[in-house]
Amino acid sequence: MDKIEHIGIAVKDLETSNLLFQRLLGTAHYKIEEVASEGVRTSFFKVGNQKIELLEALVAESPIAKFIAQRGEGIHHIAFSVKDIIAEVKRLSSEGFVVLNEKPMRGADNKWVVFLHPKGVNGVLVELCQDIPQAEVE
């Protein structure tokens, strides 16, 4: 794994949370994006070389809506940047980690993403991210 790519925070209201984090960080978000396949709308803030992703549920069945219903707003996941997501999934599977989606799916911010089950990582949902090559970006 190369670096911490971002920290994902589940929020009830993206607009209100964007204003809160703008006041906290002293800078505005640089991107808002919907990930229809996951039923979420996201915004991103830069903090030094790192990012914070705020995630708002768009539908009641989305993973973010379920997370907020069970735990309330707060840190949802930590994401790590990887160079080869397929190789990293194989490595982590061989180490006994439970991969929630072995086939990478398209996530926010032009990334391929895979998630590890939190039960095997001290209760932390881990996301692996690999940049989608520009030629594949729609």
Predicted regions and their residues:
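Vicinal oxygen chelate
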Residues: 4-12, 33, 43-46, 65-138
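Residues at alpha-helix termini
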Residues: 23-24, 70, 94
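Short, structured motif recognition centered on aromatic/hydrophobic residues
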Residues: 4, 18-21, 45, 52-55, ...
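Long, hydrophobic N-terminal alpha-helical segment
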Residues: 1-40, 47, 62
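Short Gly/Pro-enriched loop/turn and capping motifs at secondary-structure junctions
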Residues: 59-60, 85
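Hydrophobic side chains in well-ordered alpha-helices
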Residues: 17-20, 88-92
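Short loop/beta submotifs within extracellular cysteine-rich repeat domains
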Residues: 16-17, 27-28, 52-53, 60-63, ...
